[in-house]
Structure formats: C-alpha cells, structure tokens
Amino acid sequence: EFLVTDKVDIILANFTVTKDRAEKVDFALPYMKVALGVVSPESAVITDVKQLDGKTLIIAKGTTAEPYFEKNHPKVKLQKYDQYTDAYNALLDGRGDAFSTDNTEVLAWALVHKGFKVGIPSLGDLDTIAPAVQKGNKGLLDWINQEIVNLGKENFFHQDYAATLAPV
C-alpha cells in the first residue's frame, strides 16, 4: 500500500515475497528466508501446532500467517489485528494464547520480552524476504540489488543473524 500510494520509496523490513505483492511492486534480491514462528507465555508454552486447536491465536492481517492458519489449521481461532503493535499488545494483555508471524520477528520480540518463549521456531513453508520498490523504479531496484550483493560478499546477513537471533 505505501509503495503503491507513493508514501515511501522502499519497503525493506521483513517484507515477504508473495505472488500477490509481486503484481503490485518490484522485489529486489532476497536477503533472508523465514518460516512462521509461534510465541506464547512461558507459563503456557505452545510447542506443537496441534496445541492451538480450539485456542486463540493472534495474527496481523495481511501477513502470511493468515492464509496459512486458515487453510491448514481451521480449528485455531484467529484473532486478527491491523497493526503489529496491537497484535503484540494483545499477547502482552493475555487476549490470546499465542501470536504467530515470521519466525525472525517472534524470536527478536521474545528476546526483549521476558516471560515469553518461541515454542515453535519454524512452521509452514520457507518464504523469502526482500526489499521492494514501486513497479518500474529500475534505478532504485538496481542500486538495492547491488548493495545486497555487496553485503552478501561481507557475510553481513549471516553475521547479523548469528549475533542477534541465533542465541534465542
């Protein structure tokens, strides 16, 4: 939405490549692969997706978690929020049993929110994360692609993951 309406030039943070999105934006080279993850309170850690049957799972609307759970786990009650902050606050407030989104996000969130644990670190298909620009913005797309290649040569992405998320 922000690219299409010319509010921003680049979407960089945790933007999953999907067919639907690729019709609206141009994706640069991917820099990371993710699956879904599930975070829940340490007092009631969800370690298997079957534990979610009949329980309330918090998700953000429009994320890959939404179609995944609707299609593959219809017994899970989905509580959907428009904004990530609202979804995370719902988990903090106990309005749901767990929260699911990209595993890198729940790992990072659990790292700074004591009392919560990622009991399911990888669920569903592996998806790629890539920057996106407005359709047809070839100059910016080429520049981003070159920067990703340069960062890849330095092992930047691997080192960053090892330093921040791998310990979780």
Language-model features: where?
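Acidic, polar ligand-binding/catalytic clefts
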Residues: 1-51, 117-124
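Conserved functional loop/turn residues at catalytic and ligand-binding sites
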Residues: 6-7, 56, 80, 95, ...
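Bilobed "Venus flytrap"/periplasmic-binding protein-like clamshell domains
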Residues: 15-16, 33-89, 103-107, 138
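Stable alpha-helical elements in mature extracytoplasmic
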Residues: 7, 11, 48, 65, ...
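Periplasmic-binding protein-like
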Residues: 32-40, 103, 107-149, 167-168
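Hydrophobic residues within well-ordered alpha-helices
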Residues: 3-4, 52, 91-92, 131, ...
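Ligand-binding clefts/hinges and TM-proximal coupling segments of bilobed small-molecule sensing domains
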Residues: 64-81, 117-122, 148-168
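A ligand-binding cleft/hinge motif common to bilobed small-molecule-binding domains
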Residues: 13-23, 68-71, 92-125
